[in-house]
């Protein structure tokens, strides 16, 4: 307990110092005192919120135990991967394993399967997504899966998207949690009804994907000065589906609460970082729903899971950047998952 509080304070301190120096550099001496006070009050408050929410994430993590059998800590399915894109589904699926899932499946187009298998012997790869039976082929696995991550490396081929639509429908019918990213979000922007009101869905749009969804669902441009309000409104308009807007700070809402994750990352953004987020979120969503609302102190389990995945991704980015600087890539970030996880959640 003592070391946990210590680590939290150290991280919090670093954030305050970074923010204050940024403020001072920007505004110069006359505004110093005022800004400093305003900043430290506001930041101290949001850092306390962050630390409280991290504590809730720690509550949902299942203890490692020798009495459990394989598969109990999570069997995750990634739906994505086509001829053009094979990296994204690999990154999402391997991230799920590294975070603590026992098994990670990839349901991809047939051309992508040998490539993804060759990246890793640790994944189970099903070359079914472009088959006429795709929906049935995935559905028969659903009773054995705890969560689906839909979209990494999916592409926009009509036939594939039709199959994914069917997969989302059967997943909903079986109450399987779904994390939707990348071209999965493109599909949702075409047909918001697919996930409208589904409380076990989490959407993880970047800025472009967010604007497209906002446009499609609220039929008007968003107010770029009010990102909290925009995320809240999109979530509500989708029937309180959890939305995670990725950005300089990640903004999360379930239509009721808005959380901000500003865990220190780095200014390096590489393609693939979103796959680390969606893959780890698949596992955390399963753990959070398993733990239930008592463990999350009344907050939405999905929101707590999303906060955990955002913090973890940013911490991985931070650690990888310390070692590799500009040359940091997603593989370097994934190599940090173990250390980042224990720093945030097990210290
Ligand atoms: C749990 O909820 C109570 C009441 O809302 C709040 O006072 C407390 O700070 C929360 N604890 C954590 C760890 O978030
Ligand atoms: C979403 O949450 C808001 C705030 O609690 C509530 O007013 C609204 O009725 C909810 N919408 C749905 C569809 O449940």
Swiss-Prot record:
Alphabetically ordered keywords of this record: ATP-binding, Disease variant, Glycoprotein, Lyase, Mitochondrion, NAD, NADP, Neurodegeneration, Nucleotide-binding, Phosphoprotein
Function: Catalyzes the dehydration of the S-form of NAD(P)HX at the expense of ATP, which is converted to ADP. Together with NAD(P)HX epimerase, which catalyzes the epimerization of the S- and R-forms, the enzyme allows the repair of both epimers of NAD(P)HX, a damaged form of NAD(P)H that is a result of enzymatic or heat-dependent hydration.
Reaction equations catalysed: (6S)-NADHX + ATP = ADP + phosphate + NADH + H(+); (6S)-NADPHX + ATP = ADP + phosphate + NADPH + H(+)
Location in the cell: Mitochondrion
GO-annotated biological processes: metabolite repair; nicotinamide nucleotide metabolic process
Location of Phosphotyrosine modifications: 85
PANTHER family reported in the protein's UniProt record: ATP-DEPENDENT (S)-NAD(P)H-HYDRATE DEHYDRATASE (PTHR12592:SF0), ATP-DEPENDENT (S)-NAD(P)H-HYDRATE DEHYDRATASE FAMILY MEMBER (PTHR12592)
Coarse class of the protein's main subcellular location: mitochondrion
Cofactor(s) demanded: Mg(2+)
Family as reported in the entry's similarity comment: Belongs to the NnrD/CARKD family.
Class of enzymatic activity (EC top level): lyase
Binding site for (6S)-NADPHX: 153, 206-212, 275
Protein name in UniProt: ATP-dependent (S)-NAD(P)H-hydrate dehydratase
Clinical disorder: Encephalopathy, progressive, early-onset, with brain edema and/or leukoencephalopathy, 2: An autosomal recessive severe neurometabolic disorder characterized by severe leukoencephalopathy usually associated with a trivial febrile illness. Affected infants tend to show normal early development followed by acute psychomotor regression with ataxia, hypotonia, respiratory insufficiency, and seizures. Disease course is rapidly progressive, leading to coma, global brain atrophy, and death in the first years of life.
Annotated EC: 4.2.1.93
UniProt KW Nucleotidyltransferase keyword: no
One term under GO cellular component: mitochondrial matrix
Domain YjeF C-terminal: start-end pairs: 53-344
Note: This protein may be expected to contain an N-terminal transit peptide but none has been predicted.
Glycosylation sites: 240, 297
Sequence positions that bind ATP: 246-250, 265-274
GO terms of molecular function: ATP binding; ATP-dependent NAD(P)H-hydrate dehydratase activity
Source organism of this protein record: Homo sapiens
């Amino acid at each position: 307990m003592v070391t946990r509080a210590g680590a939290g304070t150290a991280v919090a301190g670093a954030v305050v110092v970074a923010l204050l120096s940024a403020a001072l550099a920007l505004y110069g001496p006359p505004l110093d005192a005022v800004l400093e006070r305003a900043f430290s009050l506001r930041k101290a408050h949001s850092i306390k919120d962050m630390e409280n929410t991290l504590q809730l994430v720690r509550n949902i993590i299942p203890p490692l135990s020798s009495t459990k059998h394989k598969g109990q800590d999570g069997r995750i399915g990634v739906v994505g991967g086509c001829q053009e894109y094979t990296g994204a589904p690999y990154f999402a699926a391997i991230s799920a394993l590294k975070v603590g899932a026992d098994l990670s499946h990839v349901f991809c187009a047939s051309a992508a399967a040998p490539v993804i298998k060759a990246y890793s012997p640790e994944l189970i790869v099903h070359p079914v997504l472009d088959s006429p039976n795709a929906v049935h082929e995935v559905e028969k696995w659903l009773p054995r899966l705890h969560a689906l991550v839909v979209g990494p490396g999916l592409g926009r081929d009509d036939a594939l998207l039709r199959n994914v639509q069917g997969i989302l429908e059967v997943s909903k019918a079986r109450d399987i949690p779904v994390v939707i990213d990348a071209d999965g979000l493109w599909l949702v922007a075409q047909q918001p009804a697919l996930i409208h009101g589904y409380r076990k869905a989490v959407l993880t749009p970047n800025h472009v994907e967010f604007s497209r969804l906002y446009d499609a669902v609220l039929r008007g441009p968003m107010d770029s000065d009010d990102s909290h309000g925009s995320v809240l409104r999109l979530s509500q308009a989708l029937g309180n589906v959890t939305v995670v807007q990725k950005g300089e700070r990640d903004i999360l809402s379930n239509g009721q609460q808005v959380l901000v994750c500003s865990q220190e990352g780095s200014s390096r953004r590489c393609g693939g970082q979103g796959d680390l987020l969606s893959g780890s979120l698949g596992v955390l969503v399963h753990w959070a729903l398993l733990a239930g609302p008592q463990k999350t102190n009344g907050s939405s389990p999905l929101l707590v899971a999303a906060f955990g995945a955002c913090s973890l991704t940013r911490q991985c980015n931070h650690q990888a950047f310390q070692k590799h600087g500009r040359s940091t890539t997603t593989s370097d970030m994934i190599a940090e998952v173990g250390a980042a996880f224990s720093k945030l959640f097990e210290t």
